[in-house]
Amino acid sequence: MARVTVEDCLEKVDNRFLLVMLASKRVKQLFKGAKPLIDNRAGNKNVVLALREIAAGKVNFEISGRKSR
């Protein structure tokens, strides 16, 4: 994946607003020292890395009893 887009992420998260919240939470985790869930040899910034992780299906979430796809 040369470029990550919102459309790539929306294949995994069906709501744009939920996607923003999920990406924000993951970026905070990365800033606090969480290990990347995908290869980051390219040295992407945390925001791009979080979106790439979501698009790759590596970030899971649950909303009040409803699990991610």
Swiss-Prot record:
State the UniProt keywords alphabetically: DNA-directed RNA polymerase, Nucleotidyltransferase, Transcription, Transferase
- Catalytic activity, as annotated: RNA(n) + a ribonucleoside 5'-triphosphate = RNA(n+1) + diphosphate
SMART domains to which the protein is assigned, alphabetical: RNA_pol_Rpb6
Cite a single GO MF annotation. Answer: DNA-directed RNA polymerase activity
Any Gene Ontology biological process: DNA-templated transcription
Database matches in Gene3D superfamilies? 3.90.940.10
GO CC annotation terms, alphabetical: DNA-directed RNA polymerase complex
Q: What is this protein called?
A: DNA-directed RNA polymerase subunit omega
The major lineage groups are: Bacteria, Pseudomonadati, Thermodesulfobacteriota, Desulfuromonadia, Geobacterales
Tell me what gene encodes this. rpoZ
